């Protein structure tokens, strides 16, 4: 049986739509899924980056040790592309062992690997805490900036929460950042930290220890 050309075209078009409708839709990450980023046993998933004068990153006693360098020092998580980019929390414990600048520079993606920011703890002489950068302003200049006291060789539990509309952070039980970011430009501070995208730990002229690093997916806020 022969069909008119117009009818044949409609049949083909309808079939195409039916096939398209049958394509699987990517499922959203299940809330509460926990991913261990550093287990204290290996640095295989991390890669040290030397931007010139950087300290070594080593595994010692179950800790990630970022040794003091003359510049930014740290390591990048090699499997970041497989992680959720939004609606997640990262938790860790960190301590400053020597030095007078930031002992936590947690660079993280916000939506995709091209849009990242850095949670800074102890910057600009040892106390500034905030996120670099928002609308081009770094952690010492924007609304997230605050002064927190950090003692050497004391462990600090840190939590970062990332959603499409908000960035939040806690040091211990104290919430130090609660910043709405809808419509704002998110980026890292121009300079050496750009070599540590999209997920990393860094320090500046400081030795630090990191442990118990986990990422947990969270439900999309309503």
What role is predicted for each listed range?
Residues 1-4:
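Positively charged n-region of N-terminal signal peptides that target proteins for export
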Residues 21-222:
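Carbohydrate-interacting regions of secretory-pathway proteins
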